[in-house]
Amino acid sequence: MKALRRFTVRAHLPERLAALDQLSTNLRWSWDKPTQDLFAAIDPALWEQCGHDPVALLGAVNPARLDELALDAEFLGALDELAADLNDYLSRPLWYQEQQDAGVAAQALPTGIAYFSLEFGVAEVLPNYSGGLGILAGDHLKSASDLGVPLIAVGLYYRSGYFRQSLTADGWQHETYPSLDPQGLPLRLLTDANGDPVLVEVALGDNAVLRARIWVAQVGRVPLLLLDSDIPENEHDLRNVTDRLYGGDQEHRIKQEILAGIGGVRAIRAYTAVEKLTPPEVFHMNEGHAGFLGIERIRELVTDAGLDFDTALTVVRSSTVFTTHTPVPAGIDRFPLEMVQRYVNDQRGDGRSRLLPGLPADRIVALGAEDDPAKFNMAHMGLRLAQRANGVSLLHGRVSRAMFNELWAGFDPDEVPIGSVTNGVHAPTWAAPQWLQLGRELAGSDSLREPVVWQRLHQVDPAHLWWIRSQLRSMLVEDVRARLRQSWLERGATDAELGWIATAFDPNVLTVGFARRVPTYKRLTLMLRDPDRLEQLLLDEQRPIQLIVAGKSHPADDGGKALIQQVVRFADRPQVRHRIAFLPNYDMSMARLLYWGCDVWLNNPLRPLEACGTSGMKSALNGGLNLSIRDGWWDEWYDGENGWEIPSADGVADENRRDDLEAGALYDLLAQAVAPKFYERDERGVPQRWVEMVRHTLQTLGPKVLASRMVRDYVEHYYAPAAQSFRRTAGAQFDAARELADYRRRAEEAWPKIEIADVDSTGLPDTPLLGSQLTLTATVRLAGLRPNDVTVQGVLGRVDAGDVLMDPVTVEMAHTGTGDGGYEIFSTTTPLPLAGPVGYTVRVLPRHPMLAASNELGLVTLA
């Protein structure tokens, strides 16, 4: 029979072992191997049985064993040392504090940052993630902690976590949802001074109120607040709001996003009050999922500070960072406008919102407007609420500027104010212990964040590098065999049928990994375009390869499940099953061994649909060589020596033909470039040319792919400027915010009437030469704005056959006087910067010292 409800009972720890509680509930243990080794020493078999979960271990260990350890001097010495190390880690000055101590930087750095995401992949024991976004968010928190960045993270606590994947006998994905007991996880309940749970409330339509308690996961120095709606104070249907990650219909999803955004801000206010912390100055939203956080902050300023909507919006924009993680419109949450209006509007009919008291409902709805008037676009709302925005690789930044160009109509895509911060990965989480040990030996007292440390790899004997790679491949093969056996048994096989698994896969064979989510654009089955060719590669007598595949399809995506089934059916074939496997239930623990042990990491998305693709970074961090389409981060950092580029048939419109061409290129690379280099050995059995690629990969990519680099980029280029803007707008009783809001109102009112009446050019000789002086004069009607309210620019560049300016250069034009009828005169003289067919135009843009850029408001008038 099944239990109605599950809960966890923990054993009492002897007083001398009390430090185990702190070590087990701070998730820093998940990236600190000495702490993991300490827990393993309590009961090695139970540690494995509990899935390397310290909280579960302490709940299951025999009390007699704890009493024994309380008298074990060696164990107690290690415990005291690790407890002291954790306390030192939590309190000592780190990179962020060193920047503050530098003086000038202290004036720019925010006192706190709030980081919002719908998923967080911090550790296997807290399965609050589904894919790359969650793992990235987890790495962001861990690296922020390692750097001392004062971050508070906010998300939802999912009672079922993400699903467990298994396979049916015919290879079809089957999902089961674990029931997670928060009391059995490294979480603590946020309580007030009386010990009562702190609840946040959000008013929904029909007089319903959604309430949530707040679980706190301590990720090193960073608290992660997880909102949980499964409490008795909620009506039955509202208790299920946080049941599953990305589960349910759109009604369910919008409730989750309302709770994450509005409830998340209220959770931060409650947490900082209870812990007596300074409220965060900067708010970072990942995707539009938590977009409602910006509107809640507007409500706070309207209600508590007495600001009008526009002034409050100005303050919120100044201190908000928006990161887009998708390169396609289909990845954006778009709700029916009627649905959003139902949640936002108040039934009293006074135009004010019940969800966000004091705010006009029409202003809220307008923030999510897009070209389809029946839709509310969460990404558009996020961008309108943020003064700073970015994609997650250089290429993705370009793709995002084009995708959101409509919000800045009149600007070329390259001018859309969306930058980029290329993602990174958390080395202590993803690098194998062997590489971390080598890194410590090479670094000495220096930091692994410094590129010079990675250059010291030239000192290491190639045979030692190859020994590490071979050791990690052997570990992977053992893990693959165990997982393969378990999967076949779950699918109905018997032990008598599985003798072949003992010799499946070979620790000496070139090992290729492909593991990721299974949306169509990632092309899981590209490798199967020519099954006979793939079989030849797998079974080559001289240079065989072996292929390990893993990934989950969304439960509602039968197309993705069909792709998985194709791979499984091919891998089930007796002649190849010892060389290719699909491993079900891809998660962090499986991924880690894949990154460690695979020689080659395969990535073949449809370009440019991969926003970043951090799995390849994790492989590179372990000396794996990438074999990838030039997409995401690989487009940016591939240099010809750190892996291989799969040629992309970008101009081919026929998808089938494109797949055939790119699959053929993949097979050719494996057969003619990758395998020969791997199997070419010297007299010591070392593949010298391969190892030099491994060394080069570590030296050049190692410092770049670190999440510590990524977080520092965010601090320096986004968080610090946002904090400065916030202080300017919020200081002096919000006077600067009022001034900027007033300017924006005046500019938006005047802009449709602004006119460039005339443009005159003089000074050029009959045959213009490069460097010849061109004088431009523009006559402009400003419709009530002052000359210093605008920037007038001359724009010069090469022109194509349709007179479209290519790679334009802008030159600011000075105000030189007032003409007849109140028209203002602007002019400039500039040398011609280019040879060949050249053209020019003139445009007018807003100008205000509080704007991050002149294109921020999306206003422009062209001649």
From Swiss-Prot:
CDD domains in the record: GT35_Glycogen_Phosphorylase-like
UniProtKB keywords: Allosteric enzyme, Carbohydrate metabolism, Glycogen metabolism, Glycosyltransferase, Pyridoxal phosphate, Transferase
Known cofactor(s): pyridoxal 5'-phosphate
MF terms (GO), sorted A to Z: glycogen phosphorylase activity; pyridoxal phosphate binding
Domain of life: Bacteria
Pfam families: DUF3417, Phosphorylase
SUPFAM superfamilies (UniProt xref): UDP-Glycosyltransferase/glycogen phosphorylase
GO BP: glycogen metabolic process
Modified residues (N6-(pyridoxal phosphate)lysine): K618
Other comments on record: Was identified as a high-confidence drug target.
Family: Belongs to the glycogen phosphorylase family.
UniProt name for this protein: Glycogen phosphorylase
Source species of the chain: Mycobacterium tuberculosis (strain ATCC 25618 / H37Rv)
Origin organism lineage: Bacteria, Bacillati, Actinomycetota, Actinomycetes, Mycobacteriales
Gene for this chain: glgP
